[in-house]
Amino acid sequence: MSTSAAPVPAQPAHPRSILRGHKAQVHAAAFVRNNERLVTGDADGFVVVWDLTIMRPRAVWRAHDDVLLGIGGWGTDRLITHGRDNKLIVWQLREADEDSLAKTLPVDPAAEDRPKPWLLYMLEISTMNFCTFSLCEMSSDPLSEDREALIAVPNTLSSEAIDIFHLPSQKREHTIRLGQSEGMVMALELFRVDGYFTVAVGYENGVALVAQQAERSETPVGTWNVRYRSKAHTQPVLSLDVSLGRDFFLTSSADSLLIKHPIPPPQTSVLKTAREDGTTSEGANASVIDSQPPALASRPPDAPVAAPPATPGKPMSLLSAALAREAAGDSAESPTRRTTQPSDTPPESTLLSEPVKVVNTKHAGQQGLRIRSDGRIFATAGWDSRVRVYSCKTMKELAVLKWHQVGCFAVAFSTIDAPAGTQAEGARDGLAARMGDVTVKEKRISHAKSAHWLAAGSKDGKVSLWEIY
């Protein structure tokens, strides 16, 4: 008889807390103020600010007259909300301001006049398509009174185009028009790569693309080139998120696919790398390029194209991939012919179209995709009521969080790495802990800031709060 103990099956995960308070389905969630607060928004336009040290509401108000599409923090004292009432609002919400705001939750039948925080800016924008905003901060100091930011939203008149607004001026800086055949913009992210403004977009027809400024600039005005386009999804894109390193982005859709896409570096970065490697500029992603690189011009037209050598375990570089495609597509053409790049689209040889990885999860309808700040995992909210956690590296499913009985619409991760401004606070907390002077309140605050939170909002109006990995 064997004396070895049988393995104990893993226990299913349980939420750390359930936040009950919304009467309508929860559509948006975001951690703000160094993870001390969780902000959630529902289909009635209500916003609830939860204090994670006590798991209680600290501020409740109706921010919009229609469905709330998105929520985001801007520094530690400002909150941005976006509703289907065609308004995007920037609120001033400091910790001291919470004392003057209502605590009565939307689910409470008691009628109460809920005051609103101070309204700083309001943009009249389009909400024809359920796509929320993207914030690109421009100021190095997120707490400066003179801070600047850009807001990207779908265009007011043309739902496939993208408007970029400037704050605090509230002026429309630029409109990006990337084509007329993709349908409505469903999800977008605006960010910068090596000083170049870049946008990742998911469309109604399942297309995901990356467009980038042709020239480095401090404003988004100018020519934008499509650098990557893929139609790997068969249904509308529901959500996307960009990695902190700006080297890839992930998309989810109404189909069952999760897709990892590349973010090409700026064309000038590719040129610089080519020169450092001894490659001629004609073979790189230049604005005016040879249809066939000089290095390949001496090859007979019918000779096979040899793929550039790849380092084991390392994907082919963007430059090598572009050269291989260029040689294969133009082998029969004259090596001396030159092609001028159009003003709105790049040469075909520079347009990437292959995703990094495509995974069929067998679970249709995953939305609210978010990548955690450490870049290790991402999560989705499922129409089947499940919250799924995946590895960013392998795209493998790591966990399925089951608690809600109806569909989930939103997920949010707390920030793992504390901002530089909180390092001194952490040092003081550590010193106090060693001295035995930590109060219960300080312990709660410390835990709220350091916990690896995952919040999920559901159709039932409840928010589940999980502590994972």
Curated annotation (Swiss-Prot):
<comment type="function">
    <text>Component of the ASTRA complex involved in chromatin remodeling.</text>
</comment>
<comment type="similarity">
    <text>Belongs to the WD repeat ASA1 family.</text>
</comment>
<dbReference type="Pfam" id="PF00400">
    <property type="entry name" value="WD40"/>
</dbReference>
<dbReference type="InterPro" id="IPR036322">
    <property type="entry name" value="WD40_repeat_dom_sf"/>
</dbReference>
<feature type="repeat" description="WD 1">
    <location>
        <begin position="21"/>
        <end position="60"/>
    </location>
</feature>
<dbReference type="GO" id="GO:0005634">
    <property type="term" value="C:nucleus"/>
</dbReference>
<keyword id="KW-0853">WD repeat</keyword>
<feature type="compositionally biased region" description="Polar residues">
    <location>
        <begin position="280"/>
        <end position="290"/>
    </location>
</feature>
<keyword id="KW-0539">Nucleus</keyword>
<feature type="repeat" description="WD 3">
    <location>
        <begin position="232"/>
        <end position="271"/>
    </location>
</feature>
<dbReference type="InterPro" id="IPR015943">
    <property type="entry name" value="WD40/YVTN_repeat-like_dom_sf"/>
</dbReference>
<dbReference type="GO" id="GO:0006325">
    <property type="term" value="P:chromatin organization"/>
</dbReference>
<feature type="compositionally biased region" description="Pro residues">
    <location>
        <begin position="301"/>
        <end position="312"/>
    </location>
</feature>
<dbReference type="InterPro" id="IPR019775">
    <property type="entry name" value="WD40_repeat_CS"/>
</dbReference>
<dbReference type="InterPro" id="IPR001680">
    <property type="entry name" value="WD40_rpt"/>
</dbReference>
<feature type="repeat" description="WD 4">
    <location>
        <begin position="361"/>
        <end position="400"/>
    </location>
</feature>
<feature type="region of interest" description="Disordered">
    <location>
        <begin position="260"/>
        <end position="354"/>
    </location>
</feature>
<feature type="compositionally biased region" description="Low complexity">
    <location>
        <begin position="313"/>
        <end position="332"/>
    </location>
</feature>
<keyword id="KW-0677">Repeat</keyword>
<keyword id="KW-0156">Chromatin regulator</keyword>
<feature type="repeat" description="WD 2">
    <location>
        <begin position="63"/>
        <end position="101"/>
    </location>
</feature>
<protein>
    <recommendedName>
        <fullName>ASTRA-associated protein 1</fullName>
    </recommendedName>
</protein>
<feature type="repeat" description="WD 5">
    <location>
        <begin position="437"/>
        <end position="469"/>
    </location>
</feature>
<feature type="compositionally biased region" description="Polar residues">
    <location>
        <begin position="333"/>
        <end position="352"/>
    </location>
</feature>
<comment type="subunit">
    <text>Component of the ASTRA chromatin remodeling machinery complex.</text>
</comment>
